[in-house]
Amino acid sequence: MSAEAGATVEQNHSYDMSCIFCRIANKQESGAELLHSDDDLVCFKDIRPAVTHHYLVVPKKHVGTCKTLTKDHVQLIKTMMEVGKSTLQKNNVTDLEDIRLGFHYPPFCSISHLHLHVLAPASQLGFLSRMIYRVNSYWFITADELIDQLQAS
């Protein structure tokens, strides 16, 4: 690790060295191509894509799962959605009506670091993927529904 990278990680008090998404977001993990990176978020391809375009939008700071969020996180979710849609457009997805944006509830999320699934085209999800990313089910919630729930709490 370079001194510069080490300093960046050291300064980020919300970094969890054991979290793969923290390591990817802070460029401590080789092999993950960042499709988007800004001061707060990164976006990269899912390692097990369910459709042609399956990306994850992840905060650089370690944030727990969608179950740990409060009203204060609504803007974060909205920004994550914007990054997801922008990444789709940069990758030639033109039909933003045929997408799915959402989160898995614990214990159905494999990584306990908030990550937005960005899927397109949603109409091409296979049978198993339609179950895994089933809209507003016991295990998966759309970003819009999560925002509604957080604002109502």
Swiss-Prot record:
Per the Swiss-Prot or TrEMBL record, the active site comprises H115
Chain location of the short sequence motif Histidine triad motif per the record? 113-117
A single GO molecular function, which one? nucleotide binding
**Can you tell me which residues bind AMP?**
D46, I47, H115, L116, H117
Which Enzyme Commission number(s) are on file for it? 3.9.1.-
Q: Which residues form a coiled coil?
A: none
* Membrane-spanning residues: none
Q: Where in the cell is it found?
A: Cytoplasm; Nucleus
Judged by the first EC level, this protein's enzyme class is hydrolase
The cross-references to InterPro entries, in alphabetical order and at most eight, read: HIT-like, HIT-like_sf
Q: Name one Pfam family in it.
A: DcpS_C
The UniProt entry's GO CC annotations, sorted and at most eight, read: cytoplasm; nucleus
Alphabetically ordered keywords of this record:
Cytoplasm, Hydrolase, Nucleotide-binding, Nucleus
Reactions that this protein is recorded to catalyse = adenosine 5'-phosphoramidate + H2O = AMP + NH4(+)
HIT domain mapped to chain residues: 20-130
This protein's source sits in the domain of life called: Eukaryota
- What's the subunit arrangement here? Forms dimers to octamers and even larger oligomer.
The entry's function note states:
Exhibits adenosine 5'-monophosphoramidase activity, hydrolyzing purine nucleotide phosphoramidates with a single phosphate group such as adenosine 5'monophosphoramidate (AMP-NH2) to yield AMP and NH2. Hydrolyzes lysyl-AMP (AMP-N-epsilon-(N-alpha-acetyl lysine methyl ester)) generated by lysine tRNA ligase.
Under PANTHER family, the record lists: ADENOSINE 5'-MONOPHOSPHORAMIDASE HINT3, APRATAXIN-RELATED
UniProt record similarity statement: Belongs to the HINT family.
Q: What is this protein called?
A: Adenosine 5'-monophosphoramidase HINT3
Q: Please tell me the species this chain comes from.
A: Xenopus tropicalis (Western clawed frog)
* Gene coding for it: hint3
